[in-house]
Amino acid sequence: RQRQMCIRDRGMVLKNTLIDYWRQVHKKWNYVEISTPQIMKRTLWETSGHWDHYKDNMYTTVIDGEDFAIKPMNCPGSILVYELEPHSYRDLPLRYGELGLVHRHELSGALHGMFRVRCFTQDDAHILLAKDQIKDEVIRIARLFDEAYSLFGLPYKIELSTMPEDHIGTREDWEKAENALADAITSIGKEYVVNPGDGAFYGPKLDFHIQDSLGRTWQLSLI
């Protein structure tokens, strides 16, 4: 089995309706829509840390004697967009939104229907900002999530996922980032629980979990 989705007829109507809503929301919240390459050189993935920390989950190939990988995440592509032109601190925060098609070599035992597949379109955003803008921006994103979840009638719970064993950066930087996320989310009255060691290799995150009709929880969004 391909472990990837084929969509047709009413499924496409639903998908396109959601995309229309996505564009409406991101325009309202001042995001710039971007599109980034599907396949990129090994050197980029080495710079981002994915080659050393995520390669087992990536689909790789060789083209003209050079290593390439299909993107499992959109993050490096957003940085390429940022580097296309010079920026001033006055431009910050810069908010990029992307509906990026990503491929991840998930273990077969982890796959689950449409909830966990090997290829999917990710509603992704990357925000370039100054350190003193972190709190306000995290609050802003949380409110965007709240608006969208409320529309669809989706209650959610929040987890703060902290530094995993396999990570980049110093413990000091991780603690600063974890504290910044915790401070921002509590300042608007949101509760969270700590999920030790479940952060991404490149940083801590606030995971937003929803519940399906069978009572199972799924991580839907993250900051």
Predicted regions and their residues:
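Phosphate/diphosphate-binding loops
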Residues: H26, R42-Y96, A180-D207
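Active-site-proximal loop/short-helix segments
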Residues: S35-W51, M114, P155-I168
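Hydrophobic alpha-helical scaffolding
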Residues: I7-M12, N16, F68-P72, Y89, ...
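Metal-assisted phosphate- and nucleotidyl-transfer catalytic regions
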Residues: S150-Q219
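Conserved alpha/beta core surface patches that mediate binding of polyanionic ligands
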Residues: R1, P72-H126, K131-A148, L206, ...
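Short, flexible loop/turn elements at secondary-structure junctions
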Residues: G11-M12, Q38-T43, I63, P72-P76, ...
